[in-house]
């Protein structure tokens, strides 16, 4: 079982990672607007991996509660 401080720290870290992913999504929209689909596709693939990692971290926290 994770202690409360560790859970809090992990949630803070996850919030930072979510904010970073949101900025990356904005970049992807810009690439699409510029018809740079290859770059947008690559950025979206990176975001997908980041979101899968976040989902795993959420599942770990939930299992520790």
State the predicted function of each range:
Residues 1-16:
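Short, charge/polar-rich alpha-helical segments
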Residues 12-65:
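Short, charge-rich amphipathic interface segments used for partner binding and complex assembly
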């Amino acid at each position: 079982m994770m202690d409360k401080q560790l859970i809090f720290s992990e949630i803070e870290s996850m919030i930072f990672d979510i904010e970073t992913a949101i900025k990356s999504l904005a970049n992807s929209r810009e690439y699409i607007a510029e018809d740079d689909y290859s770059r947008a596709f690559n950025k979206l693939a990176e975001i997908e991996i980041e979101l899968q990692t976040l989902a795993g971290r959420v599942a770990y926290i939930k299992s520790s509660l």
